């Protein structure tokens, strides 16, 4: 009987450890908010904004959602250091930014697939999808990063922008040196 109780206790302990480790490895999901909510939140608790500019028809956008943004290291880092915003580059959301109102006057709700480009997408200078746009604590555009980024590629930008390392780059070679010396820590 004692041997049975010991085995049962050991099984419970193993199950408990498994649950704890699973929660640590799985991390937290990114809490995506609207651009308006992020700008408002910055006033109370200044953090940079990471904006995922996507379209519904974009394959690499969907892949980035699945492979990059669901990566526990990426999700934890973004959740801790950024306000995360998803913005449909062809959607009909109204955006108020620096006393300007941006809309998508040619948006067609019936249209399947590609739609008209939102004015805010054009204002941000987005030329392809997905594009990650970084915005400072003060609401100023830092930089767009165009194209699919795997967790390690995105890690470079997340950390470089969070730490302000990009502000010392004075020529293109500076970024190349930074890239060459960067050692990613995020795992797949």
Question: Which role fits each region the language model picked out?
Answer:
Residues 1-29:
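Bacterial Sec-dependent N-terminal signal peptides
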Residues 28, 43, 125, 136, ...:
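Non-globular targeting/processing and membrane-anchoring segments
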Residues 29-32, 71-112:
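Thiol-based oxidoreductase modules, predominantly thioredoxin-like and allied folds used
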Residues 31-48, 78:
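A short beta-strand-turn-helix
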Residues 45-59:
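Short active-site neighborhood of thiol/selenol oxidoreductases, capturing the structured segment around
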Residues 45-49, 80-83, 127-129, 137-138:
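Loop/turn elements at helix/coil->beta-strand transitions in domains of secreted/extracellular proteins
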Residues 62-66:
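Detector for the c-type heme attachment site
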Residues 103-110, 118-133:
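Structural micro-motif
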């Amino acid at each position: 009987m004692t041997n049975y109780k010991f085995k049962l206790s050991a099984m419970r302990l193993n199950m408990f450890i498994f649950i704890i480790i699973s929660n640590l490895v799985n991390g937290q999901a990114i809490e995506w908010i609207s651009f308006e909510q992020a700008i408002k939140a910055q006033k109370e608790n200044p953090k940079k904004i990471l904006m995922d500019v996507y379209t519904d028809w974009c394959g690499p956008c969907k892949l980035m959602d699945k492979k990059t943004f669901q990566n526990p290291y990426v999700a934890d880092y973004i959740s801790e250091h950024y306000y995360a915003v998803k913005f449909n580059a062809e959607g009909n959301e109204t955006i108020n930014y620096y006393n300007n109102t941006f809309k998508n006057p040619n948006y067609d709700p019936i249209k399947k697939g590609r739609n008209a480009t939102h004015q805010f997408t054009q204002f941000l200078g987005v030329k392809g999808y997905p594009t990650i746009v970084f915005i400072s604590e003060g609401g100023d555009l830092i930089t767009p990063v165009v194209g699919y980024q795997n967790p390690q590629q995105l890690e470079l930008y997340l950390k470089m922008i969070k730490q302000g390392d990009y502000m010392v780059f004075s020529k293109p070679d500076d970024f190349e040196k930074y890239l060459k010396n960067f050692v990613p820590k995020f795992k797949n």
